[in-house]
């Protein structure tokens, strides 16, 4: 690519996009000053890495997008990389939102929620956790030990009698009972201590309270506290204190393995190791390690992420005079000899995969006083590069407080970096032992291994209660946290139209995008989905295939695994792929197909059962879906509605006396009241 006219490029923060001759974006970068950043690519070509040279050889034009602030540039870059997946960018494929625990502040009796987005409100957040299923198990354990309310605010406001959890002793029942606010607040404070990692402190306090209750002959209260302590001790066993002095930080480790680069990140809150995650990029080498580190930090922390005040990294890459966010990572800056030696040594040990944090400490020993950390001292000595400063500024704006990206400052943080590197190495080894993605790539003619696979299926009964189920597999394993259900209005049972409508809604939901989308159906379903994505401008964003079920002689679907008649279709290809019966890739695709089929039909059956009960209410003139939902939130069954009488029904918001009288007459006539025999009672279970 020829050097562009730099006078046309603004001196503002923003994003630059290299494009090839077809107009496709092949690289996205951010800059504090766009003109200086672009100019740095054409100063000394001999200093560029082969990857950067290849990118410039394929690039034909460069576009720039100015932003007002560095934070906007960071967010725009991450958004464009996720959307376009440029060929020469390092793309973080696993960009899902992790789960958090949240305790609200506005309600007089707040509940403990599991959320995926941290809002800037008065609520308290705890996390992050990578596994939603593990978080739900923790949530259940907490509720068994601490009787907090579980119902939504709307259900709380409409409830007239205590729920089942109250009768089980797992809820104080503030919706119907007078619960002192200080009693409930004390429970919330105990839960906060547990989620903050101060479990030992909480157990000691509860044990003291239990002994006091026992001495006061309140044995029932002492037994409750004893059970709570036992539940907590089982939970505490799973928590590991890794920073004796406490503190919130994320720790990143990078290591080069035989066939790529791996990165691990650990989440430490209040000195306790909460969780971690590892990633692997095949095909990357030693030269891309600096870019990988900066690119990961830029993409991993988004507007809804929980950003700690300190992010520990294994080394601080050299940067050029502008940003250092180019692919080459070359440096024109003057670096003191001692600092350069440490950086070069630590980066070299990324190549060998050895733990290097002790070397960093040995070369830059500094007293651990307050926030004057070793990493910060080193950054100050060398002069933080522009990418470093830009990331800190942008992340601080997102967090609403100071964020430091620095080297480990003590032996405890050194061990955490080593742990992150070890986890990353294990992740790379695990994926290297799983060649299934390579088999799929060859069989389906994909550009690369499909790390994320989404599969969809339509389920309905004569066009009613239509549900499209979507399941997700990552690296060959189900990822239930990402499963989704899409509901559609009743229609004529047009699967093609439903799939096309689903494609539009999938585009609206945004990334992460799959590497492969598998449709349960034949050529017709495949064509409908492909056409819909093309109309949304997503025609080439990812690969699409369909799997058509085999048929018996009677024409019914035959779902036997490995059936030779199962057919795989690709867009633009009339004939199915000639996959060998029993081949691992075919068996896997059949497993994915069966998973999405079972998931979709299960959601449809649940919707159909709920509609049957709600439909009974809507047979009464004047009662629509909204009123039916309000009634179900107040009552457990149709029989309970009949027993409530006109006054009880009229008390539900939005019902009114006239509709209450009509509904009561219908229910009593059809089902009878509680005094008229209970033959119908067993059939009228709670909705859904």
Swiss-Prot record:
The record's InterPro entries line, in alphabetical order, gives: GIY-YIG_endonuc, GIY-YIG_endonuc_sf, GIY-YIG_UvrC_Cho, Hlx-hairpin-Hlx_DNA-bd_motif, RuvA_2-like, UVR_dom, UVR_dom_sf, UvrABC_protein_C
Entries under SMART domains matching the protein? GIYc, HhH1
Q: Which parts of the sequence belong to the UVR domain? A: 200-235
Name the keywords, alphabetized.
Cytoplasm, DNA damage, DNA excision, DNA repair, Excision nuclease, SOS response
Q: Which GO terms describe its biological process?
A: nucleotide-excision repair; SOS response
Name one molecular function that GO assigns to this entry: excinuclease ABC activity
Which cellular compartments is it found in? Cytoplasm
Tell me which Pfam families the record gives: GIY-YIG, HHH_5, UVR, UvrC_RNaseH, UvrC_RNaseH_dom
Q: Which domain of life is it from?
A: Bacteria
Which GO terms of the cellular component aspect does the record hold? cytoplasm; excinuclease repair complex
Where does the record locate the signal sequence feature? none
Record keyword Kinase present: no
Q: Which residues form the GIY-YIG domain?
A: 11-90
Q: How does it assemble?
A: Interacts with UvrB in an incision complex.
Q: What does this protein do?
A: The UvrABC repair system catalyzes the recognition and processing of DNA lesions. UvrC both incises the 5' and 3' sides of the lesion. The N-terminal half is responsible for the 3' incision and the C-terminal half is responsible for the 5' incision.
What family is this protein classified in?
Belongs to the UvrC family.
- Output this protein's name: UvrABC system protein C
Q: Which organism is it from?
A: Nitratidesulfovibrio vulgaris (strain ATCC 29579 / DSM 644 / CCUG 34227 / NCIMB 8303 / VKM B-1760 / Hildenborough) (Desulfovibrio vulgaris)
């Amino acid at each position: 690519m020829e050097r562009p006219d730099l006078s046309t490029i603004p001196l503002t923060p923003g994003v630059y996009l290299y494009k090839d001759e077809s107009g496709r974006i092949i690289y996205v970068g951010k800059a504090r000053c766009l003109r200086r950043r672009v100019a740095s690519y054409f100063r000394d070509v001999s200093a560029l890495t082969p990857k950067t040279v290849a990118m410039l050889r394929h690039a034909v034009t460069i576009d720039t997008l100015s932003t007002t602030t560095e934070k906007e540039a960071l967010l725009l870059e991450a958004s464009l990389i996720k959307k376009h997946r440029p060929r020469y960018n390092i793309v973080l494929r696993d960009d899902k939102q992790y789960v958090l625990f949240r305790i609200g502040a506005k309600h007089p009796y707040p509940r403990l929620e599991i959320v995926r987005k941290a809002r800037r409100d008065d609520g308290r957040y705890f996390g992050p956790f990578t596994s939603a299923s593990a978080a739900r198990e923790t949530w259940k354990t907490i509720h068994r030990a601490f009787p907090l309310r579980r119902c939504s605010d709307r259900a709380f406001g409409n409830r007239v009698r205590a729920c089942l959890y109250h009768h089980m002793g797992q809820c104080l029942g503030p919706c119907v009972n007078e619960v002192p606010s200080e009693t409930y607040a004390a429970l919330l404070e105990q839960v906060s201590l547990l989620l903050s990692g101060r479990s030992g402190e909480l157990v000691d306090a509860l044990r003291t309270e239990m002994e006091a209750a026992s001495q006061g002959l309140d044995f029932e209260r002492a037994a409750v506290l004893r059970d709570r302590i036992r539940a907590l001790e089982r939970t505490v066993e799973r928590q590991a204190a890794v920073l004796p002095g406490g503190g919130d930080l994320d720790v990143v480790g990078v290591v080069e393995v035989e066939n790529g680069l791996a990165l691990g990140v650990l989440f430490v809150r209040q000195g306790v190791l909460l969780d971690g995650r590892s990633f692997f990029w095949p095909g990357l080498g030693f030269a891309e390690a600096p870019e990988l580190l900066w690119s990961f930090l830029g993409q991993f922390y988004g507007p809804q992420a929980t950003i700690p005040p300190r992010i520990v990294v294994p080394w601080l890459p050299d940067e050029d005079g502008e940003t250092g966010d180019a692919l080459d990572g070359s440096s024109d800056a003057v670096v003191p000899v001692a600092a350069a030696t440490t950086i070069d040594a630590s980066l070299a040990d990324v190549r060998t995969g050895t733990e290097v944090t002790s070397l960093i400490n040995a070369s830059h020993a500094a007293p651990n006083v307050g926030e004057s950390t070793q990493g910060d001292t080193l950054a100050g000595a060398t002069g933080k590069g522009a990418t470093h400063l830009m990331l800190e500024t942008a992340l601080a704006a997102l967090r609403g407080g100071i964020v430091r990206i620095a080297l480990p400052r003590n032996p405890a943080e050194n061990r955490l970096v080593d742990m992150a590197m070890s986890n990353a190495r294990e992740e790379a080894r695990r994926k290297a032992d799983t060649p299934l993605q390579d088999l799929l790539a060859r069989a389906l003619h994909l550009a690369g291994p499909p790390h994320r696979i989404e599969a969809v299926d339509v389920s309905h009964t004569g066009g009613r209660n239509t549900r499209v189920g979507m399941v997700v597999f990552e690296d060959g394993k189900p990822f239930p946290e990402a499963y989704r259900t899409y509901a559609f209005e009743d229609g004529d049972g047009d699967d093609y139209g439903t799939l096309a409508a689903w494609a539009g809604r999938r585009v609206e939901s945004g990334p992460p995008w799959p590497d492969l989308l598998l449709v349960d159906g034949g050529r017709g379903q495949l064509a409908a989905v492909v056409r819909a994505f093309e109309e949304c401008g997503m025609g080439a964003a990812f690969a699409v295939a369909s799997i058509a079920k085999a048929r018996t002689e009677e024409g019914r679907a035959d779902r036997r695994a490995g059936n030779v008649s199962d057919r795989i279709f690709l867009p633009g290809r009339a004939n199915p792929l000639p996959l060998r019966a029993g081949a691992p890739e075919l068996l896997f695709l059949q497993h994915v197909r069966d998973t999405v089929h079972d998931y979709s039909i299960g959601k449809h059956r649940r919707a159909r059962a709920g509609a049957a009960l709600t439909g009974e209410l809507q047979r009464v003139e004047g009662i629509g879906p909204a009123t039916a939902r309000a009634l179900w939130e107040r009552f457990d069954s149709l029989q309970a509605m009949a027993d409530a009488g006109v006054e009880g029904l009229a008390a539900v918001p939005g019902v009114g006396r006239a509709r209450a009288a009509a509904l009561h007459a219908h229910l009593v006539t059809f089902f009878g009241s509680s005094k008229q025999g209970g033959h119908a009672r067993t059939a009228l279970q709670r909705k859904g």
